[in-house]
Amino acid sequence: MRKFIFGIILGAALLCGMKARAQYNREYFFWMGRSSMMNNDYQEAIRTLNTLLRFDEDAFEGYFLRGIAKYNLDDLLGAEADFSTAIRLNPVYTQAYTYRAITRSRLGNYDDALQDFREAIDLRPDLPGPYYSRGVTRLLNQQFKEAIDDFDKFIRQENKVADAFICRGLSYLHLKDTVRAYDNFNTAIRTNRENPGGYNRRGGLYMEQKRFAEAEADFNKAIECDSAYLLSYFNRALVYSDTNRPMLALADFDKVIQLDSTNSLTYFNRAMLRTQIGDYNRALDDYDKVALYSPNNVLVYYNRAGVYAQLGELEKAIDDYSSAIKLYPDFANAYIYRGRLRELLRDPQGAKKDRDTAQKKIAEYRSRLSDSTYSIYADTTQRFDRLLSFDSKFSGGSFDRITGHNGGHEEMRLLPLFKFTLMRPDTVPTVERYHVQRVEDFRKRVDNEYL
């Protein structure tokens, strides 16, 4: 009997010990998962949290942390699913609503994102964070007045966050209120003089207003604050290009590519700049990179065709014009230039066909101008915008990037494809053909229209 009682007591003690050990392990896995995330080791964090969730399927915080790790690895759908599970297990989990909203904003699902922000704010109207994040989402969704209202509410509680002033300044800028935009960018700089974002945004506004010296000074300051801040190098390169300093511009584009070797927009701008200074072979190398990283961009093939033509590689130029036409069949200029090259390659029928097609496309375009509703442009414009897009992001995928340091779109632009100079008629240099009399005599003897 004593042995039986002792066995029961021993079994109970072991069960208690196992329960205590399981509880200890649960906290251990949480701690290990958080530690891995603090060290930016998100894959290890996911492995650790997977182990936790296998033993405790109701650990809503585990799903929440795993969602953050997935977000930082750009697994946005997986992150959204984990945040949704956390909310299902704990319907009043404010942070889960906030971060699911941010994830949905990244996915372009603005309506559901704004609904999640409403839930978070209804649960905790005293927290400033959701107002800021909702303001960023509204800024991305082009609801600029509503975004300003959210940033106002955030700033009333947190007036030492420079990024809030930057985002509010961007909202005013989109409303064409440059005075308030400048005021907010200046406040952001005064709030945190070590934050490159304020200098970069103000410099961008200076650049748009052709105040290049002030823009350059701001971009220099932004780079001084953060020597790895890509957008400042990129924007300063645009200033150098606009002020006819191509070698300095190339050096800054080189720096951007050194820091981000897959940035197709930077390769494209560097290719155009190299073309302008006659460095055609290296321009081709850059266009090849753009075609690799943004294969559906119509301008890549169109511009590269022009470089091939300059180098006398007419067949390759025709192939690129054909690629541009395949992507955008209404591209009249591509037909025109392909037709000219076909003439040079003794293909008069192909050349005539391209000329006729180009004239037809131009006539169709002109006829559309009479459509006062512009409805006929709706699909074509959106499609052409996609054909001009580049697979480039200067911002990363972390929560800091979307809710902190960058706050909205990082605006990048192309170098101008053409530059024009207005001159008086008597100062315009006349174009003089190289004249050799023997060549002229030969042309007359042969009497062929293709010479």
Predicted segments with their positions:
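Eukaryotic alpha-helical solenoid repeat scaffolds
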Residues: 303, 309-310, 326-451
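Structural marker of alpha-solenoid helical repeat scaffolds
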Residues: 55, 89, 123, 157-158, ...
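Register position in tetratricopeptide repeats
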Residues: 38-39, 72, 106, 140, ...
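Canonical positions in the second alpha-helix
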Residues: 51-52, 85-86, 119-120, 153-154, ...
